[in-house]
Structure formats: structure tokens, C-alpha cells
């Protein structure tokens, strides 16, 4: 994405790019040959929705081409994608390590999965061929060709970006998920150490953690929209947010998989003890990785360091000394958790003719 001077230009370019990327994958999704196409279309819709949220104060979008309309399409894609993630987890990460008897016991789960996916794909197909999707893409394309950005549009992007981005970050810092399994020490929240697996399972099942993962993803997308306006100063934070999102995703995957098995296979824990143990082990490992990042992000100096960056756009802007010192002390590149499944992989390489639109 090229750097632009006005808020209207930045908003219009961003909306246009993400609309093009999202709609690029629609024909392949309807052919249903590679789950990666669905994944990329869903990501495109999420980024388009994020752009509408970030630039909401400046956008005057046509009816049927607004953020709730994008969200409705995204929900249909998400239902199907969740089933694909379950299939990849079971087939590639867990099934190869199961004893023969447990592998057979898992087969009814795959049958149930195929039935559920058939229904979900039928809904996605109807959605992408339906009037709502067609109105959304047509009217939004027309808007990008003749954008209406209201009175704030002509303002310099650098002047307005702090007012758009800092509130987004504040909502993340105020999320209650950060306080899961913490205790107050010296007037500051600290993660509780040495929890047993049973207690960890209780904490992992709390909706606050799932909500935090979604909020981290949302903020990461939001900051990526404006990252070019800050040079390379957001790169470390974006990488750390990605690692945190992956770790929380691992915790969430185990819950989603267990819920699926409860519906697919009666008494699955008794029939699949090895799988049950593997899921528990996966949660325990991811929990330790989560607590390391949790401790970092509960540090007020670390939080303020990112806030100070967002306050001063520009590739060559100088950070306040206190913020820079805090980041040198606390910022390390977070290790991404080992992940055998391609469930959250990046876009598969395609030939030049098949590449999605460049941003």
C-alpha cells in the first residue's frame, strides 16, 4: 500500500484494496477445491470490515455496503472455515499419532464432520450467489470509484491517525481477558504460576480469553492498515500480536475440537483417551506461552511504549526516551507456538496469473 497524504485517500485506497482481495477468491470458494481459498476470502472480509471500523468517522458508505453487511457475509464464511480447521486438526495433527483402535473410533467423527460441512457449504454458496452479497460488492465498488468521505476527508492522515488508532489500542488494554488467572502483587496484576492442568482447563474455558483473542486480532488488523504511516516502528508489535493471537488460537482450537467431539461421538473421552490426553497437553503448553506474553502486556511501560508510537506518525519520528527504554527492556520477538496444522497458514503460493490484487 502506498503512503497517502489525506485521510480520504488512505481510507479509499484501503477499502478498495481489501474489497478486491476478498472478492478475488469468490469463484474459487464456490468451486470448493482448496480450503485455503475460503480462508483467504474470510481474511479479506475481516480486513475489509476492520477498515470500515477504523475509518468509520470519515466514511459515508451507501446502504447495503456497510460494516454490518460485511460482518453478515463473514459469519457465513466463518462457520464453514471452522469445520475446515477441525478437519485439518484431526487429520494432520492428531490422527497420525492415535493407536489403531482409536483411529477407528474417530471415524464417526469424520462422517459427522462431512455432513456438517455439506450443510455449511450450501449456506455459503447461497450467500455468495445471493442478492445481499451482490449488492454489497457492487455498491462498494461504485463507492471506491466515486468515494464520499465527508468533511474529515481532506485532513492530513498524519494529523488524524492518533485519534483513530489510540482508542482502538485502549479498548484492547482494558479487556478483562488480560486479568485471567492473575493476582495483585505490589499493586500490580501478575499471572499466577504453577497451576495444575485441571485448573488451567477451567481458565481456558472462560469466554474472556476467547474475547481477548478476537480483540488482539482486530487490533492487529487495524494497526496493519496504518503501518505504512509509521515506517517500520510497528513491526515488532505486529509480530508480537501475531504470536499472541496464535497462542490464544491454540487454546481456543482445543475447546472447539472438544465441543465438536461431544456432538459427534458419544462418550468420546472414554473411546479416545490418547486424543483426550493430547488435547490436554496442548492446552497446558499453550497456557505457559500465554502467561509469558500476558506478563509482558500487563506491564504499564510496555503498553505506554506502543501508545507513544501511535501518537506520532511518520517513519522517522523519534520515540520519547522513557518509551524507547521500556521497549528495549521488555520487547523480545515472541516465539510462535509449534503448529503442525496449516489451519491458520498464510496464503498458498500461486502462479503470477493467479495472484490476488496487490496492495
Language-model features, listed with the residues they occupy:
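Cationic, histidine-enriched alpha-helical/coil surfaces that engage anionic ligands
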Residues: 1-359
Amino acid at each position: 500500500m502506498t503512503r497517502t497524504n489525506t485521510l480520504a485517500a488512505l481510507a479509499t485506497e484501503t477499502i478498495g484494496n481489501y474489497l478486491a482481495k476478498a472478492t478475488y477468491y469468490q469463484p474459487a470458494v464456490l468451486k470448493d477445491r482448496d480450503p485455503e481459498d475460503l480462508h483467504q476470502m474470510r481474511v479479506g472480509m475481516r480486513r475489509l470490515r476492520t477498515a470500515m471500523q477504523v475509518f468509520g468517522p470519515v466514511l459515508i458508505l451507501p446502504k447495503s455496503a456497510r460494516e454490518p453487511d460485511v460482518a453478515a457475509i463473514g459469519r457465513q464464511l466463518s462457520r464453514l472455515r471452522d469445520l475446515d480447521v477441525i478437519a485439518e486438526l484431526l487429520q494432520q495433527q492428531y490422527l497420525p499419532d492415535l493407536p489403531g483402535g482409536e483411529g477407528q473410533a474417530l471415524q464417526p467423527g469424520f462422517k459427522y464432520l462431512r455432513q456438517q460441512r455439506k450443510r455449511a457449504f450450501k449456506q455459503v454458496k447461497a450467500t455468495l450467489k445471493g442478492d445481499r452479497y451482490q449488492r454489497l460488492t457492487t455498491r462498494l465498488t461504485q463507492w471506491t470509484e466515486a468515494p464520499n468521505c465527508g468533511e474529515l476527508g481532506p485532513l492530513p492522515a498524519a494529523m488524524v491517525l492518533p485519534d483513530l488508532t489510540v482508542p482502538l489500542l485502549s479498548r484492547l488494554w482494558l479487556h478483562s481477558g488480560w486479568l485471567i488467572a492473575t493476582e495483585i502483587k505490589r499493586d500490580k496484576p501478575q499471572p499466577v504460576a504453577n497451576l495444575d492442568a485441571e485448573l488451567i482447563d477451567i481458565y481456558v474455558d472462560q469466554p474472556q480469553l476467547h474475547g481477548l483473542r478476537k480483540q488482539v486480532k482486530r487490533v492487529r488488523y487495524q494497526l496493519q492498515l496504518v503501518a505504512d504511516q509509521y515506517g517500520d516502528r510497528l513491526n515488532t508489535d505486529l509480530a508480537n500480536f501475531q504470536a499472541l493471537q496464535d497462542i490464544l488460537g491454540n487454546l481456543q482450537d482445543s475447546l472447539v475440537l472438544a465441543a465438536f467431539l461431544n456432538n459427534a461421538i458419544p462418550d468420546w473421552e472414554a473411546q479416545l483417551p490418547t486424543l483426550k490426553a493430547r488435547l490436554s497437553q496442548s492446552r497446558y503448553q499453550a497456557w505457559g506461552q500465554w502467561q509469558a506474553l500476558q506478563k509482558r502486556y500487563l506491564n504499564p511501560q510496555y503498553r505506554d511504549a506502543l501508545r507513544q508510537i501511535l501518537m506520532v506518525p511518520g517513519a522517522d519520528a523519534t520515540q520519547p526516551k522513557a518509551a524507547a527504554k521500556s521497549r528495549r527492556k521488555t520487547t523480545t520477538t515472541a516465539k510462535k507456538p509449534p503448529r503442525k496444522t496449516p489451519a491458520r497458514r498464510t496464503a498458498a503460493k500461486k502462479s503470477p496469473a493467479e495472484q490476488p490484487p496487490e496492495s
